[in-house]
A protein has these predicted regions:
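A conserved short coil-to-beta-strand element within the FAD-binding core of flavoproteins
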Residues: 150-159, 179, 200-218
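Flavin-binding catalytic cores
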Residues: 243-246, 250, 266-269, 289-293, ...
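Rossmann-like flavin
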Residues: 69-192
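C-terminal catalytic lobe of FAD-dependent flavoproteins
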Residues: 147, 279-280, 304, 320-364
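Glycine-rich FAD pyrophosphate-binding loop
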Residues: 3-24
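Central helical "cap/lid" subdomain
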Residues: 18-21, 212, 218-272, 308
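Glycine-rich active-site loop/strand segments that organize a redox cofactor
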Residues: 25-93, 113
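Hydrophobic anchor at the start of a short beta-strand
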Residues: 9, 147, 232
Length: 364
């Protein structure tokens, strides 16, 4: 959009191509309906119960990390009913806007990224959790997200692959306008379209420091070269706070490690085509052509991206419980990436205290 309006735009990326970090193998959902923040009144007690489980949906590895403790204190302050409702409103508003912009973009730019516009089903296996979700869904409907409760039979009618798991389910919520797709393929194609519009990409350019004076950013040092511009946007995901801290900016963004498994599907495999969210396990399922992406959980363990076998197998195990007729066509590919999480789950978008520096981070 900037290039179209006549701006000269440059992108610095430390990777050799676009979409190789946070976007590489994530859950692949465009989920306005997934707007309830992690910080809500139920989470503190749940997190305590999960602490001893290596496969828990939300895992905090307590360590000598001042940034993590500061983040956790802020997180607890966001767990009140009043703050939760305010955060839901902001997240839904931004998500609705983002989905509209994506749909408008697809109407004018050819994009193929295994996208499906079949909605998202939130699955529940506990009646108390289902009742709590119904209250949250009612709040989201107030703000424009049409998330409606369904019976088990209605859920299976929308996604027949759930039929073998009927006895596990107590109900679901469904948002028909939500979508799914391959974020990596989307990012790669968008990079090509941007390059065709005149955007210059500098790959393999690791930003080492920022030069600032007089309340303004004067340049970005990357790969031994100083890049200068009129306006800068910091969009480095979980690494944004590390880069901006020397400038006196302390952003409440901390890396939340998420896991995914990508399963190649045999021709006779019974797998979902509607994107799903398993609320109890904090796992999502997205159909990407002849692949099934299983992703989720959050592990707070600094910037570590090493795979934990227990957490990887928990994804596969849950998929087998829900879809016993799932037949892989080969080995699953496991991946872990860092989601830039704020305590409220509301991202940081817009101006910073530095006059010509904007933020676009915290979307975890």
């Amino acid at each position: 959009y900037l290039a179209r309006t006549g701006h000269q735009v440059s992108v610095l990326d430390r990777q050799p191509a676009a979409g190789l970090e946070t976007s590489f193998a994530n859950g692949g959902q465009i989920s306005v309906s997934h707007a309830e923040p992690w910080a809500n009144p139920q989470t503190p007690l749940r997190a305590l119960a999960w602490m001893r489980r290596e496969d828990s949906p939300l895992l905090f590895r307590l360590r000598c990390d001042a940034a993590l403790f500061d983040w956790l204190l802020r997180f607890l302050r966001e767990c009140t009913p009043r703050r939760t409702r305010a955060n839901v409103q902001q997240i839904v508003s931004l998500a609705l806007y983002s989905r509209r912009q994506l749909q408008a973009l697809r109407a004018e730019v050819p994009l193929a990224y295994d996208q499906l516009e079949r909605g998202i089903l939130h699955l529940y296996t506990d009646r108390r959790e289902f009742a709590a979700a119904a209250a949250a869904a009612a709040v989201m409907r107030e703000y424009g997200c049409e998330r409606r409760p369904l019976s088990v039979d209605e859920s299976i009618a929308i996604e027949p692959a759930l039929a073998p798991a009927r006895s596990l389910l107590v109900g679901a919520d469904y948002t028909a306008a939500d979508e799914s797709g391959d974020a990596h393929r989307f990012t790669q194609q968008m990079a090509r379209h941007c390059a065709a519009a005149g955007v210059v990409f500098h790959y393999g350019a690791t930003v080492s420091s920022l030069r600032a004076s007089g309340g303004r950013l004067q340049g970005v040092l990357a790969g031994g070269e100083l890049h200068q511009a009129d306006v800068y946007v910091a969009a480095l995901g979980s690494f944004t706070p590390l880069l901006l801290r020397p400038l006196g900016l302390r952003l409440p963004v901390y890396p939340a490690k998420g896991y995914s498994a990508t399963v190649p599907l045999a021709a006779d495999s019974v797998a979902p085509t509607v994107s799903l969210i398993d609320d109890a396990h904090k796992i999502v399922f997205s159909r990407l052509g002849q692949r099934l992406r299983i992703a989720g959980t959050a592990e707070f363990n600094g910037y570590d991206t090493a795979l934990n076998e227990v957490r990887c197998q928990a994804l596969i195990g849950r998929a087998r419980q829900l879809f016993p007729e799932l037949r892989p066509a080969g080995e699953s590919e496991f991946w872990a990436g860092l989601r830039p999480a704020t305590p409220s789950n509301v991202p940081l978008i817009g101006r910073s205290p530095i006059a010509n520096l904007y933020l676009n981070t915290g979307h975890g």
